[in-house]
Amino acid sequence: MDIMKDKIRQALSELDILATEVQIDQWLDYLKLLEKWNKVYNMTAIKNIDEMLVKHLFDSLAVAKYIKGDSTVDVGTGGGLPGVVLAILYPQHQFTLVDSVGKKIMFLKNVKKSLSLNNINPLNTRIENLEGNFDNIISRAFSSVDTFYELCKHFLTEHNQMLAMKGRDLEERNLESLHLNIEKYSIKVPFLNAERNLIVIRKKL
């Protein structure tokens, strides 16, 4: 476990993120819960906690600096990614975690109780049925950025942003014709030798 903590500290340093030992312990406790539940409920395709460290924890932390304001909705959160990871980092920020799969929301309610994460609100619903105002609408669940935008565009205002976490395949052809500001960032995930990108969508003022 000390080796894993050292790896987290190194990743935090590379990402220029300040975190306490308590937060590091919370991230590890979260991954242990995810690994445990995964054996029964198939929460994520990644089974090994060492691999989760990089592909889940560090991947989520790599977008932390792009989070603005004080409220975020994580669309298709699954096992809580990136929402739970970011909620631990930003305890004053409110995270609404949305998924249509009941067992995943049941897991997140367990995470909330086990880690005393009072700034997460897991909701078992479809995103198109949700209403509310959020500073950030984030997801790493969609294969298509177009689909993400279509399902979540009712949240987008002149004062917030949508963030799509993507691998190499960037599909947003249909967005180019809309009245939107679209910015693409190449994301470096510590210990991961793979292309990661973040697409930020805002309304043009």
Curated annotation (Swiss-Prot):
<feature type="binding site">
    <location>
        <position position="76"/>
    </location>
    <ligand>
        <name>S-adenosyl-L-methionine</name>
    </ligand>
</feature>
<protein>
    <recommendedName>
        <fullName>Ribosomal RNA small subunit methyltransferase G</fullName>
        <ecNumber>2.1.1.170</ecNumber>
    </recommendedName>
</protein>
<dbReference type="GO" id="GO:0005829">
    <property type="term" value="C:cytosol"/>
</dbReference>
<dbReference type="InterPro" id="IPR003682">
    <property type="entry name" value="rRNA_ssu_MeTfrase_G"/>
</dbReference>
<keyword id="KW-0949">S-adenosyl-L-methionine</keyword>
<dbReference type="GO" id="GO:0070043">
    <property type="term" value="F:rRNA (guanine-N7-)-methyltransferase activity"/>
</dbReference>
<comment type="function">
    <text>Specifically methylates the N7 position of guanine in position 527 of 16S rRNA.</text>
</comment>
<keyword id="KW-0808">Transferase</keyword>
<keyword id="KW-0963">Cytoplasm</keyword>
<dbReference type="Pfam" id="PF02527">
    <property type="entry name" value="GidB"/>
</dbReference>
<feature type="binding site">
    <location>
        <begin position="127"/>
        <end position="128"/>
    </location>
    <ligand>
        <name>S-adenosyl-L-methionine</name>
    </ligand>
</feature>
<dbReference type="InterPro" id="IPR029063">
    <property type="entry name" value="SAM-dependent_MTases_sf"/>
</dbReference>
<comment type="similarity">
    <text>Belongs to the methyltransferase superfamily. RNA methyltransferase RsmG family.</text>
</comment>
<keyword id="KW-0698">rRNA processing</keyword>
<keyword id="KW-0489">Methyltransferase</keyword>
<feature type="binding site">
    <location>
        <position position="81"/>
    </location>
    <ligand>
        <name>S-adenosyl-L-methionine</name>
    </ligand>
</feature>
<feature type="binding site">
    <location>
        <position position="140"/>
    </location>
    <ligand>
        <name>S-adenosyl-L-methionine</name>
    </ligand>
</feature>
